[in-house]
């Protein structure tokens, strides 16, 4: 994951519309000049437990990760650093609140594990 500016990556202000789960959010990206783009963003570099599963223990951890993310993003100004698109066509991004890398913080707080895009 990236802590500082990385060449070739773009930063955007985003409006979080919905937290899908602990590693996926729906946002509106401010492209500037009053142009917005709505999309689903997969948080790059992390994997959170599934919140929609029959495994009750994983579901419990997944719902906790989702709630933790809601608590960190709701009512805050959020920025996103784009990392292109992933293998399923979703935008990949890192989220920041007041300069804090939320993706990284999720791993540090135990709500997600590091993930490089391979098999889980």
Give the label of every model feature segment.
Residues 1-120:
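Small beta-barrel nucleic-acid-binding modules, primarily SNase/OB-fold domains
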């Amino acid at each position: 994951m990236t802590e500082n500016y990385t060449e070739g990556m773009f930063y955007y202000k985003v409006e979080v519309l919905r937290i899908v789960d602990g590693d996926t959010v729906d946002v509106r990206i401010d492209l500037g000049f009053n142009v917005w783009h709505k999309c689903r963003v997969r948080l790059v570099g992390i994997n959170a437990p599934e919140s929609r599963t029959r495994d009750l223990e994983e579901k419990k951890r997944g719902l906790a990760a989702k709630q933790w993310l809601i608590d960190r993003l709701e009512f805050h100004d959020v920025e996103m650093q784009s990392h292109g698109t992933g293998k399923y066509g979703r935008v990949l991004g890192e989220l920041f609140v007041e300069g804090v890398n939320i993706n990284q913080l999720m791993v540090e707080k135990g709500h997600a594990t590091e993930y490089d895009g391979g098999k889980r």
